[in-house]
Amino acid sequence: MKSLLFLLSSLTLTALTWKDFKSYEGKFRVLTPTGEMTEKIKKISTGLGDVSYHTFMYRPEEKNPDCVFYVVNYFDYPKGTFPADSTDLINEFMEETVNESVKAVSGTLTYQSDIQLLTHKGKIWRVQYNGDRVLIKSKCYLVGDRFYLIQTMMKKEKSMNPSADKFLDSFQAF
């Protein structure tokens, strides 16, 4: 009985450590295990000009965590790049995003589906790579001309962990 109480109290404490992380410049919020993320900004040249690629990352320090990392990326396309009525262009962009993410890690796409964040189109997908030992779960959204990419990476044996879904599902743009 004592071990059951200890287990339940441990689970409760673990659940309580998740905190809200907000980026006012990035106009998003997400839950992370500690409420902390570090930001890096990289300039990238595209066919539409230079963009600032923002990466927010949390990497657990514990041994054998549910997820190896939690990431939110965003960047802004020039104003008007994706008119709201350009459904085909937005769908093509989302498909290309998924394909490029698979190609970037020489992985295998195991799942993908269309999703929405309020009225904004998005995608969810999973990629296995590194001899199918590692899994990346991703969501992306296009909010106006801002692109968000939310990802977690884990070992395959941890692929069903609740932390990945908690992180991905908590994302909100504001």
Residue ranges of each PLM-predicted region?
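Bacterial Sec-dependent signal peptides at the C-terminal "C-region" and cleavage site
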Residues: 11-19
